[in-house]
């Protein structure tokens, strides 16, 4: 099993799909990494040589991934909340922040429905 950026990549997957197991890498980025490293993205992870894995690791050094990316995202949201802007306020209240309606829908952000009895109190 290949280990890249501290993540075990499933060996049976193609290189393009396997790289998406790393937080911060999607299909497009994975494909660009494979092209830059000179690896066919249809090649399975278990078929990659140590040299191929090193080429992939070299490509990943320029990207913000995993814990650093999660930390950066969290800090950006915290900054919005600290400055008291509209988006920060909506984050704090757990509501959608991009103008969607909330009278109905928005259940993903708001969570499960509260019963009518809970609203009357």
Curated annotation (Swiss-Prot):
PROSITE patterns: RIBOSOMAL_S13_1, RIBOSOMAL_S13_2. GO terms for biological process: translation. GO terms for cellular component: cytosol; small ribosomal subunit. Signal peptide: none annotated. Residues 94-121 are annotated as: Disordered. PANTHER family: 30S RIBOSOMAL PROTEIN S13/40S RIBOSOMAL PROTEIN S18, SMALL RIBOSOMAL SUBUNIT PROTEIN US13M. Belongs to the universal ribosomal protein uS13 family. HAMAP family: Ribosomal_uS13 (MF_01315). This is Small ribosomal subunit protein uS13. The gene is rpsM.
């Amino acid at each position: 099993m290949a280990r890249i950026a501290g993540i075990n990549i499933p060996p049976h997957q193609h290189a393009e799909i396997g790289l998406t197991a790393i937080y911060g890498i999607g299909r497009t980025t994975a494909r660009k990494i494979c092209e830059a490293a000179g690896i066919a993205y249809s090649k399975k992870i278990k078929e990659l040589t140590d040299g191929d894995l090193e080429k992939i690791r070299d490509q990943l050094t320029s990207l913000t991934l995993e814990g650093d990316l999660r930390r950066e995202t969290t800090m950006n949201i915290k900054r919005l909340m600290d400055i008291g802007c509209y988006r920060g306020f909506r984050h704090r209240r757990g509501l959608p922040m991009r103008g969607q309606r909330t009278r109905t829908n928005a259940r993903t952000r708001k969570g499960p429905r509260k019963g009518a009895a809970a609203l009357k109190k």
